């Protein structure tokens, strides 16, 4: 099952409240800091019972998922405006859509859904939930989520969160 591997990845994600005026700057900064966070917090090179070539197997494995869409990890460029943010997030495939009260697979870009159905904020929120950049705005919650750190040993379980918040 293509989705099964999601059940065995573990990251240490931090969400914090963010205002509209600072959202893009902090989103761009969070993505820029991803390699540093990974370098300082990676501790999971094992995947599927074998040593992977990555210091963080989760980051390495997820990087291959629809890589051309930049669905995971860092984006190829910073966001320049909220319009640019929405336009960029509308390019990837709308993986899972809601139709007639049911959740169904989809294989078309999200912009195509918008073209056919008009503005649809609820659909956008559902779509952006399945885009896993190292830092991502969570519009439904008014937060920025920074997500590339591996889970830390219990004695240091707050270290990654403190680092991310401090940055």
Features from the language model and the residues they span:
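Residues forming anionic-ligand binding surfaces in small-molecule and nucleic-acid pockets
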Residues: 3-13
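Short cationic amphipathic helices and targeting signals
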Residues: 12-17, 146
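C-terminal accessory/tail domains of diverse enzymes
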Residues: 5-6, 20-167
């Amino acid at each position: 099952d293509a989705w099964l591997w999601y059940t065995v990845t573990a990251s240490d994600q931090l969400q914090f409240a963010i205002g509209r005026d600072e959202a893009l700057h902090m989103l761009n900064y969070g993505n820029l800091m991803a390699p540093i966070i990974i370098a300082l917090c990676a501790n999971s090179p094992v995947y599927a019972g074998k040593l992977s070539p990555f210091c963080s197997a989760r980051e390495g494995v997820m990087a291959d998922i629809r890589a051309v869409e930049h669905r995971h990890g860092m984006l190829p460029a910073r966001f320049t405006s909220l319009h640019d943010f929405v336009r960029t997030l509308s390019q990837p495939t709308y993986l899972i859509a809601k139709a007639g009260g049911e959740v169904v697979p989809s294989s078309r870009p999200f912009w195509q859904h918008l073209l056919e159905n008009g503005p649809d904020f609820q659909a956008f929120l559902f779509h952006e939930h399945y885009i896993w950049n190292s830092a991502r705005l969570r519009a439904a919650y008014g937060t920025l989520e920074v997500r590339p750190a591996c889970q830390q040993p219990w004695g240091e379980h707050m270290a990654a969160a403190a680092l991310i918040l401090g940055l």
